[in-house]
Regions:
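Cys/His-coordinated zinc-binding microdomains
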Residues: 36-39, 53
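Conserved hydrophobic positions within beta-strands
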Residues: 66-68, 98
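Short nucleic-acid-contacting surface segments enriched for D/E, G, S/T with interspersed K/R
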Residues: 101-113
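OB-fold/S1-family single-stranded nucleic acid-binding modules
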Residues: 118-131
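Cys/His-enriched microdomains
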Residues: 33, 47-50, 107
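Residues immediately within or flanking Cys/His clusters that coordinate Zn2+
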Residues: 29-32, 39, 46
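A broadly conserved sequence feature marking short terminus-proximal activation segments
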Residues: 1-30, 130-131
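Beta-strand/loop nucleic-acid-binding surfaces
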Residues: 93-102
Length: 131
């Protein structure tokens, strides 16, 4: 079953810590945080590195490419949708929606690319579609 109608998406909460992330999303760019102490990239973007707890992190533009790690299709919703974990080419894994596809043809390890979907009064949300 493919997504035939668009779901109304609530606007994300934007804080001073995530403002750059959402500003980039509005320009169609996906950012991750990278720790300059241990070299690990992470998502959801936050100032403190979850690996070494350093506060020496910087914004890095991600390629927008990844693979599906795991997913589930929610068919009981008014508009069916797929939610899953995508492993980004840069390493971090993010919880996201998989959109604009036939949900019955999704599979783990499938290549995906980022798309940005509008929200109700806020910045767009990064989601993924099969590449």
């Amino acid at each position: 079953m493919s997504e035939t109608k668009e779901r109304k998406l609530p606007a994300p909460a934007v804080s001073a810590e995530t403002q750059a992330y959402w500003d980039a999303a509005a320009k169609g760019k996906l950012l991750v945080r990278k720790c300059t102490s241990c070299g690990q990239a992470h998502h959801y973007p936050r100032t403190i590195c979850p690996f070494c707890f350093s506060d020496k992190t910087e914004w890095v533009e991600a390629s927008g490419k990844g693979t599906i790690y795991s997913y589930s299709v929610m068919r009981r919703a008014p508009v069916p949708y797929a939610i899953g974990y995508v492993t980004l080419a840069e390493g971090p894994r993010m919880l996201t929606n998989i959109v604009d596809c036939d949900f019955d043809k999704l599979k783990c390890d499938q290549a995906v690319t980022v798309v940005f979907k509008p929200t109700d009064g806020g910045p767009p949300l990064p989601m993924f579609t099969p590449a």
